[in-house]
A protein has these predicted regions:
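Extended acidic low-complexity intrinsically disordered regions
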Residues: 1-18
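Short, surface-exposed, charged amphipathic helix/loop patches that serve as local interaction elements
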Residues: 27-114
Length: 114
C-alpha cells in the first residue's frame, strides 16, 4: 500500500468510529458527533473564523456536526438564524466547544519544543 492509501484508510477508520455524545440538560436531549470531519465540512467553519465571524462559525459547526443517535444531521442550514438569535449562547458555546474539541487529536505530550 502507498502512503496515500494508508492515510485514506486511517481517516476512514476515524470517520466510521463510534459517535460521541454530549448531554444537553436544557434541551432535554443528547447531541451526537464524530471524532473527525473532512475538510469539506471544516472549510466553511474555518472561512467564517477567518472573516472574524466567530459566533457564526460556532453555530455553523453545530449545524454541520450535530447528529441524532442514528447519525443523521440534527440541524439544517435554515436553522442558523434561530440558533443565533433564539437559543441560549452559553449552551451553543458548550456544544460547539465539545464538538470542535473532539476533532483535535493532539495530545500534550505529542508536541515537543525544538
Amino acid at each position: 500500500m502507498s502512503v496515500l492509501d494508508n492515510a485514506k484508510d486511517h481517516f476512514k477508520q476515524k470517520l466510521s468510529g463510534e459517535l460521541k455524545k454530549i448531554t444537553i440538560r436544557e434541551w432535554k436531549t443528547d447531541v451526537y458527533y464524530k471524532g473527525a470531519y473532512p475538510f469539506a465540512v471544516e472549510s466553511k467553519i474555518l472561512e467564517l473564523q477567518q472573516q472574524g465571524k466567530v459566533v457564526e462559525a460556532l453555530v455553523e459547526s453545530i449545524i454541520q456536526k450535530s447528529l441524532t443517535p442514528d447519525g443523521k444531521k440534527m440541524f439544517q442550514s435554515g436553522d442558523k438564524w434561530t440558533l443565533m438569535n433564539e437559543v441560549d449562547p452559553a449552551v451553543i458555546t458548550r456544544i460547539a466547544g465539545a464538538i470542535n474539541s473532539a476533532t483535535l487529536d493532539v495530545q500534550p505530550g505529542d508536541v515537543e519544543k525544538n
